[in-house]
Amino acid sequence: MMSINLNLIMAFSLALAGVLIYRSHLMSTLLCLEGMMLSLFILMALIISHFHMFSTSMAPLILLVFSACEAGVGLALLVKTSSNYGNDYVQNLNLLQC
């Protein structure tokens, strides 16, 4: 169990590093965020099943629902930005520009 937790924490850390490194492109950032959410989902499900905390068994599913909503909104934003500007740079999302 300890090695599985360590692998999931490493996956989360690598996805977080990917967000920090590839923050100029929206698609790369969305993929790294999905990796973070997936590792959090698996880690929460494993911890809940290992400690038999069935009162909080809905928490991973709620996290998965929010992750799906985040992915949907992110992809809609990516499509809108790509059609308007022709690229997926995050700097195009600045709302202060006219």
From Swiss-Prot:
Source species taxonomy: Eukaryota, Metazoa, Chordata, Craniata, Vertebrata
GO-annotated cellular components: mitochondrial inner membrane; respiratory chain complex I
PANTHER family, per database record: NADH-UBIQUINONE OXIDOREDUCTASE CHAIN 4L, NADH-UBIQUINONE OXIDOREDUCTASE SUBUNIT ND4L
Entry similarity comment: Belongs to the complex I subunit 4L family.
Natural source organism: Lagostrophus fasciatus
Alphabetized Gene3D superfamilies for the sequence: 1.10.287.3510
Protein name, entry field: NADH-ubiquinone oxidoreductase chain 4L
Membrane topology value: Multi-pass membrane protein
Residues passing through the membrane, by range: 1-21, 28-48, 59-79
GO biological process, one term: ATP synthesis coupled electron transport
Keywords on record: Electron transport, Membrane, Mitochondrion, Mitochondrion inner membrane, NAD, Respiratory chain, Translocase, Transmembrane, Transmembrane helix, Transport, Ubiquinone
Catalytic activity: a ubiquinone + NADH + 5 H(+)(in) = a ubiquinol + NAD(+) + 4 H(+)(out)
